[in-house]
Amino acid sequence: MAEIHNGGELCDFMENGEIFSEHSCLNAHMGTENTGDTYDCDEYGENFPMLHNSAPAGETLSVLNQCRKAFSLPPNVHQRTWIGDKSFEYSDCEEAFVDQSHLQANRITHNGETLYEQKQCGRAFTYSTSHAVSVKMHTVEKPYECKECGKFFRYSSYLNSHMRTHTGEKPYECKECGKCFTVSSHLVEHVRIHTGEKPYQCKECGRAFAGRSGLTKHVRIHTGEKPYECNECGKAYNRFYLLTEHFKTHTEEKPFECKVCGKSFRSSSCLKNHFRIHTGIKPYKCKECGKAFTVSSSLHNHVKIHTGEKPYECKDCGKAFATSSQLIEHIRTHTGEKPYICKECGKTFRASSHLQKHVRIHTGEKPYICNECGKAYNRFYLLTKHLKTH
C-alpha cells in the first residue's frame, strides 16, 4: 500500500491503483501511523495492521491484505464479502448488508435523509468523508507552488506535471512513431490515432472521439454552449483558441509573417498552413480516394463526402451540411447577414474565405505559383486550369 499521510493530498493504493470513496476506505487513506497492533485473520492466515487517524475520536482502522482495501472495522467484517455473509437485512427493500454502517446508509437512502450538508454547493452526503472531500474541492486548497512562474496546484503530482512545461521534459514516448508527451494521459489519447480506437461517442450525431476532451468540445456544437466570451465586444466562442484568435481582431496583431510572400498571420499555425501553399506539401491524405490536403480539418471535411455524413442541419429549411462552418454560412442566406467587410471598397461577404479571395484583387497577391513556368494566380482553380496547358 502507498504511504499514508495526513498532508491533505489524496493518493491511491499502489497494489491495484484504486482510489476509494467509501467512509472507511478514505479514513484509512488519511491515517498517519501504524500502531503495531494487528488483527489475525483465521480464514486466510494473515495479520492485519491496525491504523489510526485524527478524524473521529477513538476510531480505528485496519487493512485487509487479501484485497488491499482499508476499513474502519476489524477485518472480520470485511471478510463477510469474501465468504458471502450478509448478516444485516433491511426490511424496506429486503437487501442484505455485511455490516451495520452499510445498513444505516441504505436506510438513509430510503428515508431521504442526509447527514452531512455542504453549504457552498448545497449538496448533501451520507458519509462524513464524502462531505470532507467536497469541502476540500470548494476551499480549493493549493499548497504546491511552481518556483518558475508562481502558479499554485492542489496536488504535488499536478505540480510535477506542470514543471515539465518549463524543463521541456517529455517522458512518455509513443512506441509507434516516437512522439513524446509530458503526461501519460496525452500519450494514451495519441496512441488511439494508431489503433483507430474512439471510445467516446456523441449521443446526438454518433460521431466518435479518441479523447474525452474532444467529445466535450464537440458537444458544444449541439448544445450551442459558448463559454469563452470576449470582454471587449461580448462575442462568445465554444473553443478557447477561437477566442484567442478573436482577441487579435481588436488589436489587429499579426506577428507571424511569411518569408516568401510577406503575408502576416495571427498565429503560427495559420502561417504553417499557409506556407504549404508555397511548398506544395499536403501531408493529410484520404485513405478512400488518395486526395491530399494541406490541413487536417480539410481532410476531415472531405472524408464526409465518402461517408455521406451531414450532422449539421438548418432549422429553417432542413438542409444538412457536413461541417458546422458550412451550416453557419448557409444560415446567413436566410438572415442576409454579411459580417465580413473589405476595408478597401466596403464590399461585404458571408464568409471570411470569400473576403480573403476578394482582397487579393486590391493587394495583387497571387499565392498559387506554377512550378513549371513560374506563372502565378490569385485563385487555386486558375492554377489548376493553367497546369493542364503543360
From Swiss-Prot:
The keyword Repeat applies. Keywords: DNA-binding, Metal-binding, Nucleus, Repeat, Transcription, Transcription regulation, Zinc, Zinc-finger. GO terms for cellular component: nucleus. Coiled coil: none annotated. One of its GO terms (biological process) is regulation of transcription by RNA polymerase II. SMART domains: ZnF_C2H2 (SM00355). It comes from the Eukaryota. A zinc finger (C2H2-type) spans 88-110, 116-138, 144-166, 172-194, 200-222, 228-250, 256-278, 284-306, 312-334, 340-362, 368-390. Belongs to the krueppel C2H2-type zinc-finger protein family. This is Zinc finger protein 121. It comes from Homo sapiens.
